[in-house]
Swiss-Prot record:
Keywords: Methyltransferase, mRNA capping, mRNA processing, Nucleus, RNA-binding, S-adenosyl-L-methionine, Transferase. It is found in: Nucleus. Its EC number is 2.1.1.56. MRNA binds at N438, N439. Belongs to the class I-like SAM-binding methyltransferase superfamily. mRNA cap 0 methyltransferase family. This is mRNA cap guanine-N(7) methyltransferase. It comes from Cryptococcus neoformans var. neoformans serotype D (strain B-3501A) (Filobasidiella neoformans). InterPro entries: mRNA_G-N7_MeTrfase_dom (IPR004971), RG7MT1 (IPR039753), SAM-dependent_MTases_sf (IPR029063). The keyword RNA-binding applies. It is an enzyme of class 2 (transferase). It holds the Pfam family mRNA_G-N7_MeTrfase. Responsible for methylating the 5'-cap structure of mRNAs. One of its GO terms (molecular function) is mRNA 5'-cap (guanine-N7-)-methyltransferase activity. GO terms for cellular component: nucleus.
């Protein structure tokens, strides 16, 4: 024992004196055991025994560490020196208090920290780039300070430099104070001087700080004492920002060109929508110009433009979509009457003018010319009384003093005697196949040449109104029907009344259109020149070729009321086929079980009046008819400004239109063909059908 004057106590006397401190010494081997002889090197704790990393210090060991020892006395005044970058072999400092070394739940690496060691700034700011453990971390090494030579140790000294893990490490380096040390070739490079500008510590790590994603790497710092104020002050903190992450520009590979699910609106569609909006807006509509007045005003003549080309199959369809695009009117304002009647005491002008605006008609029937709403104020009893009067005005009989010729009277009496059997009983006709085929032919002609929309039709020889529904499908605005048989005209008017929402106005007159002008029977508002878009004559025009006067009157009535560009359509027997009589046939008769034709003479002088008797089962009962000389007919039409645009026999029309988009499906809808594609006509009916042909003329 020796007396220590500084501590004022006896301390054990050392047997071996401490060797002089060297400026350069090699680090001790990692697992050196202390000398058993109690030498001074063993007392200096240069080579502490290996410790179990997760084991905490006991209370006895903590008390022993605070005992006065010569090593503590000799090491208190040791000057600061640069330490190696290697992890310290004594992870637990002797002066570390017990509570900070044994904190519950802390990691084993936190127990090995020293107050004089700081974490690398890169280890605090960077996250783990991959899920596996990094070399040197507590999870990837058996020892908390395990080291893998394949990875370089990051240091605060090198945090501001560009590091390379593949660069070979130096075996020795020199510190700022000249002290040298030696380390393995795979260890970290030598630290820069403490006062170098390349390193400024971020903060001093304490055991309570949480560890980062990387394993803690400690850099030994000089031991500071309270007596040295210069070492208690740290360099001011300088924020250190990591390098910005690499930005990859968004440039995906497109599989297709960019597009939109929205349907674009084209300029023509916009113009169409604006036109519809303008027509439906009452504030933008101008008052209709006065067309006719019973006060004596003259109606302005329309100025239609001639047709530039013939209508094609793609221009329109015979069955366009049907909808009510006109405003509906109360039932009390719907009239089936013919000529308008003015209210007594009412002014002759104003709403009594006629014809009305055909483009704004009611879907139920005729407009009677009275102010809207007036009939709605009448009592129901008055309306019932007026209904009878309106029904009486539907048909106008022959003009007073008009006398029919004997042959015309025979024809009129024949058709008047034909009963109206209706659609149901018509199916039992022995020539139902031929009738349906003739209706299909008329539908083709109407579909090809009808004026759309809101056309005006003059039907000469309307019969019982069998074509009313066909013209309804063409969406016409006005229909005027005339026939020589007054009973047939009455039946046509009755059929029109039974139509649900016909969509057009209809007027019917009993009149001989081949002997007298139409102005004798038509009301003033319906006999305006160039008023009609279509004039039709179906299976009746051949009656006009009794003489030249009737033929010319027929052409005059057509040409006068047909506008420029309007179409005149019709069906007539083919005179060339009828004149193909056998030379040895003395009876001048031919036909089959369906029809028969008998001439009175084989050769006839002139082009008019060549008559024959025609019989058709369940249709025509031996009435006189006349051949139509085609060349003469075309010549008469040309004199009146009508140009031939269409001429085909019935079998040619069938061959041409049976596969068309518009008229091919009509063969099945109208019953010409059944579901198996079989025709309802037999050979005799087909022979009778081929006796006729269809035509169309355009007014120039």
């Amino acid at each position: 024992m020796v007396y220590d004057p500084i501590r004022d106590c006896d301390v054990p006397a050392p047997h071996i004196s401490a060797p002089p401190l060297s400026r350069s010494r090699s680090p001790p081997p990692p697992h050196r055991t202390p000398s058993a002889s109690g030498s001074l090197r063993g007392l200096l704790n240069d080579s502490p025994p290996p410790r179990e990393p997760p084991r905490a210090a006991s209370v006895h060991e903590d008390a022993e560490s605070h005992r006065p020892k010569l090593s503590n006395i000799l090491n208190d005044a040791e000057p600061p020196r640069q330490r190696s970058m290697l992890p310290p072999q004594q992870p637990i400092h002797a002066e570390l208090e017990h509570g900070r070394r044994t904190s519950a739940g802390s990691h084993a690496a936190q127990l090995a920290r020293s107050p004089s060691m700081s974490l690398s700034p890169r280890s605090q700011n960077q996250s783990l780039p991959y899920p596996s453990s990094r070399p040197g971390s507590a999870a990837g090494s058996a020892h908390p300070f395990g080291y893998d030579p394949r990875q370089g140790t990051l240091s605060p000294v090198l945090s501001a430099r560009r590091t390379s893990e593949d660069q070979p490490r130096p075996t020795s380096s020199s510190s700022a104070s000249g002290r040298r040390y030696t380390e393995p070739a795979s260890q970290t490079p030598a630290p820069a001087p403490l006062g170098s500008s390349a390193y400024r510590p971020r903060h001093t790590s304490t055991p309570g700080n949480p560890s980062s994603a990387y394993a803690p790497r400690f850099t030994p710092q000089p031991t500071t004492t309270p007596s040295s104020p210069s070492t208690s002050q740290h360099t001011p903190y300088t924020p250190h920002h990591s390098a910005p992450p690499r930005i990859l520009h968004y440039n995906p590979h497109r599989q297709s060109a960019p597009s939109s699910v929205l349907r674009p609106i084209y300029p023509d569609e916009v113009a169409h929508l604006r036109q519809l909006a303008h027509a439906n807006n009452p504030l933008r509509q101008k008052p209709a110009a006065r067309r006719y007045s019973y006060s004596g005003g003259r109606a302005p003549e329309p100025t239609p433009t001639p047709r530039t080309s013939l209508p094609g199959e793609n221009d329109h369809s015979y069955f366009p979509p049907q909808w009510d695009d006109r405003p509906s009117m109360p039932p009390s304002e719907v009239s089936y009457g013919g000529p308008p009647s003015s209210t007594p005491g009412a002014p002759p002008s104003g709403y009594s003018q006629y014809p009305p605006n055909w483009e704004a008609q009611t879907p139920g029937g005729n407009w009677n010319g009275e102010r809207p709403g007036r009939l709605g104020k009448r009592r129901a009893r008055d309306e019932e009384d007026d209904e009878y009067e309106r029904n009486k005005r539907v048909v106008s009989g022959p003009v007073a003093g008009q006398a029919y010729s004997k042959k015309v009277t025979v024809v009129a009496e024949h058709y008047n005697s034909r009963p109206e059997v209706g659609v149901e009983r018509r199916e039992f006709s022995p020539i139902i196949g031929l009738k349906k085929f003739n209706n299909w032919i008329k539908s083709v002609l109407i579909g090809k040449f009808a004026y759309r929309p809101r056309g005006k039709v003059l039907d000469v020889g309307c019969g019982k109104g069998g074509d009313l529904n066909k013209w309804k499908q063409a969406r016409i605005a006005l229909y005027v029907g005339l026939d020589v048989a007054d009973q047939s005209v009455q039946q046509a008017a009755d059929r029109y009344r039974r139509m649900p929402k016909p969509g057009f106005d209809a007027f019917f007159y009993a009149h001989d259109c081949f002997s007298n002008p139409l102005s004798d029977v038509l009301s003033p508002e319906l006999q305006i020149k160039d008023l009609y878009d279509n004039v039709t004559m179906q299976f009746c025009m051949h009656y006009a070729f009794e003489n030249a006067a009737k033929a010319r009157m027929m052409i005059e009535n057509v040409s006068r009321y047909l506008r420029r560009g309007g179409i005149f359509i019709g069906t007539i027997p083919n005179a060339e086929l009828l004149l193909q009589l056998p030379d040895r046939d003395e009876e001048l008769r031919f036909g089959n079980s369906c029809y028969s034709i008998q001439f009175t003479e084989r050769r006839h002088k002139g082009v008019y009046g060549h008559d024959y008797r025609f019989y058709l089962t369940d249709a025509v009962e031996d009435v006189p008819e006349y051949l139509v000389d085609w060349e003469n007919f075309v010549s008469l039409a040309s004199e009146s400004g009508l140009r031939l645009v269409y001429k085909k026999a019935f079998h040619e029309i069938l061959q041409e239109e049976k596969d068309s988009r518009d008229f091919g499906p009509l063969l099945g809808k109208m019953g010409v063909l059944n579901e198996y594609g079989e025709s309802a006509m037999d050979a005799d009916q087909w022979e009778a059908a081929n006796l006729y042909m269809g035509f169309a003329f355009e007014k120039m």
